[in-house]
């Protein structure tokens, strides 16, 4: 089971509830919210700019599919950004904690 970071952008007003839902469902061990992000993107033929919050969810590759489905269900965007990045290395005790928090039989 490998640890991953999942990057998700969301409107500032939706981000805290989304983060809490992912942690409560044990789909992520932790979600950092980085407010104040400005995104520039092309949508439906137009260049757009929007203020967003970046969510960085720590989870495992085994939980990614369920996390993605939860984000798609809860997210206000028609096409939310959900990007997984593999972790090559991490502080071993932190990695153990992360894995335990998204397991079916978590430790405290």
What are the residue ranges of the model-derived segments?
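Positively charged, small/polar-rich N-terminal and surface patches that mediate targeting and assembly
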Residues: 1-108
